[in-house]
From Swiss-Prot:
It is found in: Cytoplasm. This is Probable linoleate 9S-lipoxygenase 7. Binds 1 Fe cation per subunit. Iron is tightly bound. It comes from Solanum tuberosum (Potato). One of its GO terms (molecular function) is metal ion binding. Fe cation binds at H522, H527, H713, N717, I861. The keyword Translocase does not apply. Pathway: Lipid metabolism; oxylipin biosynthesis. Monomer. GO terms for cellular component: cytoplasm. The lineage of its organism: Eukaryota, Viridiplantae, Streptophyta, Embryophyta, Tracheophyta. It comes from the Eukaryota. It is an enzyme of class 1 (oxidoreductase).
């Protein structure tokens, strides 16, 4: 034992004893692969032992010289390492001994202070006191980076895992609790540094770069009635030179260094996987482009066989000096991942699920409709409740935007029913992208995009599947918006050129749906709206607060992935602008859609009822009855929703038994006030916000937060590669309008419909970029933590919540079995469809990689 053990702590008391503890730490790393100079492994810890001190804080014995605060023990220091928990490489965990003096008066420690006098930071995972007399084991869950003490303005403090409501906090810990929250809030000034732990808000004024010219200017989102938006994390970077209201951007090469509070950054395994997947995608992206240089039609796929070559046949590794130089520059861990032998080669994209069983089934009408219920964007379809469909756009600004679909277009496909009869029998549904797209369509079509706003009507057949009836494609009126639109209606056909036109009509719908999915269903409704909850929770709820402990796992990595997205995905000229049809108007469009965002409607039952695909029914298991019984997303989702709500109800009910306890919780009230007035401040005056006056309002709100962060995000994210990895199925852009009779394009459509289709949808370069992106986003990292799991089994000391969490996990296991059973039921045709792709996006658990299943706790990718 080489650590220094101090004595004489208690001023001459002879009843002092030794309390032994175990500290688990992880060494520093830079790119989360190698940083031997900063490593805190092996012999370096022999020196470090004297440079990391721990002081316990009593929760029962006060310090008369320190006001109403708990007494500190004398410093104790790290001793020799006990064991290494993982292989001794960058990112490994090592356990160390530490010994404290203790006596009866000191009682149970409620917190400890750590001081790092070393030159490098390290990751502190936990401290466990093995046997505090009369109290047993005391566990401190830390999971935090500790920088050298000179970087901090106040002590680093960690609390034991016993939760307390503010009013129940031991008096001697109260000041520490309050001061820690003040530290995390900061003062709203200055540029944030890597070691900062400050959570603060800002508007989206960092998407553009006006210093690089007008084409790189982007609208500021948030802080205005015209473009409202959820708040993001503040970085404090200086303004641009040309626009003092725009925040400057960091160089692309430094993208990984964009500020988020240090403990919000990806862990070492997550960063390793993330960078590896990105490198694989870059290689997969570049090689076909090199081949295209020698192609007669560069940047075009000439046939579907050309597209399929992305996934087949290019496994042979290249040789020569270029490849050797590339591999020499890549860290060892990445090379192992890149060259692994699990069937995914570096030089080809994995075969997407939608074409794994059949190369052509994706083109069927049944699959086109099924993906509205079980694909990557199953949250848009709604029941048709008026015919013809009417627009909600202001007629003074946009003229007549109502649908031109008539009964004559569809009544021959309604199994003998009239339109009114079909509507009254809940048989008619609509995929409606018209009102979202029309206000921007004139501007969008001035770019390379040439597309329409679409409405698709569908009929619910007796076998439970949906049948497309008609597609309406609309353009802004050439004489001006006030004159409405020009529209054309297309109906199904399987004969001649009309069949090819119908396939193109479905492609235009898919372009609409893909853009709406990526910007609204995915980015806005999960990533963007959840970030204010992350910030407010850390600013207003102490780590001691039970609700902080409830929600904390559902915020893991969200600020990091969102910051990365602002840097390289949703920024001006970023990957998203380069791949979706909305182009440079994408984020601005999402701000307009946010005007209609309603927090209580994000609850799954409320969403289903609002879209008319379910009705309230107290006799149904989840309080609603589905009008499409075989609706995989809704069926599985309601099971998950119910499990989450039961867990949250059990948990919250343990701490709050009355309205009064909710109202007197000053941290809880400050949290909810800040969420409404700052985090989602552009909607602070909306009447629908829960008032947070009752336990039920807390339960409902926390259930919705967890649902958004976990299951909703899983449903709209991890199916991206399985369905959109094959771009003809979900094209992101259309480059020319529907061919008109008598034109060369129409003749080409008759002569070579496949080539005409491919020349209409996403070009080769955009396809490769888009497929590379969705492959990265669809992968689970190897350190993912799924719904029903926790990073530490010691996350709380309270036994009843631990038992409730165990029940939650068992319920999720039961749901997995039910999903497997439903997917094996041949009567439920929408579960797998013509492409034979079983619906598993709400299957709770998964292994790492491209699995098409698994619900991570948080918006983590």
């Amino acid at each position: 034992m080489i650590g220094q053990i101090t004595s004489g702590l208690f001023g001459g008391h002879d009843d002092s004893k030794k309390v032994k503890g175990t500290v688990v730490m992880m060494n520093k790393n830079v790119l989360d692969f190698t940083d031997l100079a900063g490593s805190l492994t092996g012999k370096i810890f022999d020196v470090l032992g004297q440079k990391v001190s721990f002081q316990l804080i009593s929760s029962v014995q006060g310090d008369p010289t320190n006001g109403l605060q708990g007494k500190h023990s004398n410093p104790a220091y790290l001793e020799n390492s006990l064991f290494t928990l993982t292989p001794l490489t960058a990112g490994s965990e090592t356990a160390f001994g530490v010994t404290f003096d203790w006596n009866e008066e000191f009682g149970v420690p409620g917190a400890f202070i750590i001081k790092n006098m070393h030159i490098n930071e390290f990751f502190l995972k936990s401290l466990t006191l093995e046997d505090v007399p009369n109290h047993g084991k005391v566990h401190f869950v830390c999971n935090s980076w500790v920088y050298p003490s000179l970087n901090y303005k106040s002590d680093r403090i960690f609390f034991a895992n016993q939760p307390y409501l503010p009013s129940e906090t031991p008096e001697l810990l109260r000041k520490y609790r309050e001061n820690e929250l003040l530290t995390l809030r900061g003062d709203g000034t200055g540029k944030r540094e890597a070691w900062d732990r400050i959570y603060d808000y800002d508007i989206y004024n960092d998407l553009g770069n006006p210093d690089q010219g007008k084409e790189n200017v982007r609208t500021t989102l948030g802080g205005s009635a015209e473009y409202p938006y959820p708040r993001r994390g503040r970085t404090g970077r200086p303004p641009t030179r040309t626009d003092p209201k725009s925040e400057s951007r960091i160089p692309l090469i430094l993208s990984l260094d964009i500020y988020v509070p240090r403990d919000e950054r990806f862990g070492h395994l997550k960063m390793s996987d993330f960078l590896t997947y990105a490198l694989k995608s870059i290689v997969q992206f570049i090689l076909p482009e090199l081949h295209a240089l020698f192609d007669g039609t560069p940047n075009e796929f000439d046939s579907f066989e050309d597209v399929l070559r992305l996934y087949e046949g290019r496994d042979q590794l290249p040789q020569g000096p270029l490849f050797k130089a590339l591999t020499a520059a890549i860290p060892l861990e990445m090379i192992r991942e890149l060259l692994r032998t699990d069937g995914e080669g570096i030089l080809r994209f994995p075969t997407p699920l939608v074409i794994k069983d059949s190369k052509t089934a994706w083109r069927t009408d049944e699959e086109f409709a099924r993906e509205m219920l079980a694909g990557v964007n199953p949250i848009i379809i709604s029941r048709l409740q008026e015919f013809p469909p009417k627009s909600k756009l202001d007629p003074e600004a946009y003229g007549n935007q109502n649908s031109t679909i008539t009964a004559e277009h569809i009544e021959d496909k309604l199994d003998g029913l009239t339109v009114d009869e079909a509507m009254n029998n809940n048989k008619l549904f609509i995929l409606n992208h018209h009102d979202v797209i029309i206000p921007y369509l004139r501007r969008i079509n001035t770019t390379i995009t040439k597309t329409y706003a679409s409405r698709t009507l569908l009929f619910l057949q007796d076998n439970g599947s949906l049948k497309p009836l008609a597609i309406e494609l609309s353009l802004p009126h050439p004489d001006g918006d006030q004159f409405g639109v020009t529209s054309k209606v297309y109906t199904p056909s399987d004969q001649g050129v009309e069949s090819s036109i119908w396939q193109l009509a479905k492609a235009y719908v898919a372009v609409n749906d893909t853009g709406v999915h990526q910007l609204i269903s995915h980015w806005l409704n999960t990533h963007a709206v959840i970030e204010p909850f992350v910030i407010a929770t850390n600013r207003q709820l102490s780590v001691l607060h039970p609700i902080h402990k409830l929600l904390y796992p559902h915020f893991r990595d969200t600020m990091n992935i969102n910051a990365s997205a602002r840097q390289i995905l949703v920024n001006a000229g970023g990957v998203l602008e380069s791949t979706v049809f909305q182009s440079k108007f994408a984020m601005e469009m999402s701000a307009v859609v946010y005007k209609d965002w309603v927090f209580p409607d994000q609850a799954l039952p409320a969403d289903l009822v609002k879209r008319g695909v379910a009705v309230e029914d107290s006799s149904s298991p989840h309080g609603v009855r589905l009008l499409i019984e075989d609706y995989p997303y809704a069926v599985d989702g309601l099971e998950i929703w119910s499990a989450i709500k039961s867990w949250v109800t059990d948990y919250c009910s343990f701490y709050y038994g009355s309205d009064e306890e909710i109202l007197k919780d000053n941290e809880l009230q400050a949290w909810w006030k800040e969420l409404r007035e700052v985090g989602h401040g552009d909607k602070k005056n909306e009447p629908w916000w829960p008032e947070m006056k009752t336990p039920q309002e807390l339960i409902d709100s926390c259930t919705t937060i967890i649902w958004i962060a976990s299951a909703l995000h899983a449903a709209v994210n991890f199916g991206q590669y399985p369905y959109a990895g094959y771009l003809p199925n979900r094209p992101t852009v259309s480059r020319r309008f529907m061919p008109e009779p008598g034109t060369p394009d129409y003749e080409e459509l008759k002569r070579n419909p496949d080539k005409a289709f491919l020349k209409t949808i996403t070009a080769q370069l955009q396809t490769l970029l888009g497929v590379s992106l969705v492959e990265i986003l669809s992968r689970h990292t190897t350190d993912e933590i799924y719904l029903g799991q926790r990073e530490s089994p010691e996350w709380t000391k309270d036994k009843e919540p631990l038992a409730a969490f165990d029940r939650f996990g068992k319920k999720l296991t039961d749901i997995e079995k039910q999903i497997i059973q439903r997917n094996g039921d041949n009567i439920l045709t929408n579960r797998s469809g013509p492409v034979n792709a079983p619906y598993t996006l709400l299957f709770p658990t998964s292994e790492g990689g491209l699995t098409g299943k698994g619900i991570p706790n948080s918006v983590s990718i």
